[in-house]
């Protein structure tokens, strides 16, 4: 019988679906394992082989944990609101719902064709009113807690898309060729800053890649500093700045405020007012990225006003520059050009003084010195001196002096800003708020608030969403009076902030999630997805989860205990797969040519899961040959009879088998799938070489291979007489004695160069290893006439002799 991947893969996918083989159990006595993918946005372009890498990895872990006796939750759904479907609707008039349904069907078919063991009874879609009812419910809870508010804010406006972008989205859209400008707009904002400290601190509680944790730490941007008041000459008020370096106050030679600072125009003297207004208008056309780039040329305008340095009484000129942002600190900074590169460049351009206050190894007039490791100089007045002090001591002494004078106070600041949450588009969750004629706002009482049908999907010219044109939906009246519904919708991130909870209890119409089910399943044991979501989805979902924790809806402080970021699979040209490059490898093409098992194995065999690696079609052909070898362990293709015997394997084969069990188990736990597959390849070759077709070894191999190649292993498992699915088979346990080699090959080096090898029994002493090494013929000649200076023995691995010529 020949291996026909097409027929048997369809057979088993159909059977798994009919029997609901992978439905999670209601048995809460079993240990649970919740393994989750970052669920996909169902785009019109379908899935390519790169998309499948993470899904394959989670499926391997789901199947592996089932065999280990865990109750596994492994669901799939669709993050289906979003701009692409709406843009398509604007071009074609096709309702986004229809486009989304079509794309979801395509994605679902591909994922099922891969044999992924999802519990499809839990499938969710963020555009389903039964789902976004609870997204709206969470929003109202945020509103009730004062964490959702309306503000007139300067937003990142994309004219082509007619939509507001979150700060975290700007870089991507600019890279895609869109124009992004700043403009004021009425927006719903979520107060994520209220959770900044918890979002930072609780990163220590999760098993995440350190680079992702660091990206979140940097984005939150906690800093300890001071707010210092500078008295404004001629204005009877103070200008408050935020600084992390009060120890450098004596070196401040000018102040800078942002163009949006409320005092920007007020500080402009008559002669400077025109220039100041012009500069402020120009700044509005720039994105924050353009304004704050380290390589950008510094621009600015002098207001004509001066402020008094509280440390030395000097009058410092007040400038306006777009590299200062109102959203961070106070929107005003003190500039110490000798010890800050940005301030130094600005001072050089505009001829401002540069004063050394940190002892520098070079002339600060020629080059900035921004190190903290030196001590203070030129920093004293009649009341305080911090000369000779290190950073921490000087910081504390200066802070205490400023506080005693009422000129400053210690302050913890964050770069993190509140989340601009609303979008001016149609295809998103309606925000369930009603605005009344008396100026009050009230929540919708009947959820879900669904989207009306519209004839045109373009945002209005005023920046409102198309919902503003649907008067029958927009206006209403209730016991509180006449109202106008909110026309902004939620961003795509909303539905993905909490979807992991809905998978636990997807049909519940009375609650977001049943408390007993939440307590059993949470938190997510393994979450796999791309690192590009580090400061977007992963931060937003942590924020919402903490709010739900405070509300008593969830029992854990963090949603995802372990996070793993898969590396990207590149095209065969070593470039990122994209239509424009023409290097996309469609998943369906590979599936029809090689089958799901070959594709799954190849993607995991390409290299370490977390590394970037290129696709190579020739490589998958080698995997196909391996699967045929596995097939031939059971079937004789010439006679179409089974080869399986009830014979006991030899001692050597048993040892090889238990070494494989140990290696595959340990590597799978660590998601080192490429080396686990390599170990199974070695075992299969050894079995064929020894002519060993024992049921014991074959069945063990099939169970080890089943998470990686489920279709062929199901078929062969059935052929060996098993009525139940291999997914319920017990994972083999290795015998430590059999998994250890009795005889080891020891390398011998002389002065670090390999000169020979010898075999030694496992457990031999260092002394025995050294004596045996000296007797190796190819080694002895390099020791002859030499003085052995040092002998090094690494048990079970190598012996190294350090030698020099005898005197």
Swiss-Prot record:
GO terms for molecular function: aminoacyl-tRNA deacylase activity; ATP binding; leucine-tRNA ligase activity. It is found in: Cytoplasm. GO terms for biological process: leucyl-tRNA aminoacylation. Transmembrane segments: none annotated. Pfam families: Anticodon_1, tRNA-synt_1, tRNA-synt_1_2, tRNA-synt_1g. It comes from the Bacteria. The keyword Protein biosynthesis applies. It catalyses: tRNA(Leu) + L-leucine + ATP = L-leucyl-tRNA(Leu) + AMP + diphosphate. The keyword DNA damage does not apply. Its EC number is 6.1.1.4. A motif ('KMSKS' region) lies at residues 576-580. Its main location: cytoplasm. GO terms for cellular component: cytosol. It is an enzyme of class 6 (ligase). Keywords: Aminoacyl-tRNA synthetase, ATP-binding, Cytoplasm, Ligase, Nucleotide-binding, Protein biosynthesis. A motif ('HIGH' region) lies at residues 40-51. ATP binds at residue 579. Belongs to the class-I aminoacyl-tRNA synthetase family. This is Leucine--tRNA ligase. It comes from Chlorobaculum tepidum (strain ATCC 49652 / DSM 12025 / NBRC 103806 / TLS) (Chlorobium tepidum).
